[in-house]
């Protein structure tokens, strides 16, 4: 990591009341006061597996999907990341990902996380806990709620590649 940068910052969910789940943890590597690289730790909910995507923030190229995240998305996809890293407190951190079908080149998925950087201290942590006391459960319930809606719409279901 030293040749890439001299500081690492983690963007992740907090553990609430002993419960922890985070579909995406992001490690930003900073060199000379600028974020230069990002390590995205992706978790898939039903299988409790993790995969890592290492990204050069100055050379974000499309790359093949390497990890089965959702049973509603096939593996034959390509990812494109658009990142505005948290270089300072003034500009927002934006993590945007799009996935495209390798067969048709159509966009099949799009997600954006837009956050403002804030200091980590006791008062900020207390405010966060009081404002969102059940964040872990909310995230997990949201994922399963969306999955149920997709099932009811009869969206195709793709088995885990290692389970075939």
Residue positions per predicted region:
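Mature, function-bearing regions of proteins
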Residues: 1-164
């Amino acid at each position: 990591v030293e040749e890439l940068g001299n500081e690492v910052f983690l963007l992740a969910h907090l553990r609430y009341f002993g419960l922890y789940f985070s579909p995406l943890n992001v490690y930003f590597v900073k060199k000379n006061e600028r974020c230069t690289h990002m390590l995205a730790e992706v978790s898939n909910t039903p299988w409790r597996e993790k995969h890592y995507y290492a990204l050069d923030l100055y050379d974000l190229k499309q790359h093949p999907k390497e990890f089965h995240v959702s049973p509603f998305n096939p593996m034959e996809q390509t990812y494109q990341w658009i990142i505005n890293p948290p270089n300072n407190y003034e500009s927002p951190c934006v993590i945007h990902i799009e996935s495209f079908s390798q067969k048709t080149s159509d966009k099949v998925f799009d997600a954006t996380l837009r956050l403002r950087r804030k200091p980590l201290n006791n008062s900020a942590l207390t405010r966060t806990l009081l404002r969102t006391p059940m964040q872990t459960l909310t995230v997990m319930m949201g994922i399963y709620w969306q999955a149920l809606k997709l099932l009811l719409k009869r969206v195709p279901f793709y088995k885990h590649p290692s389970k075939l």
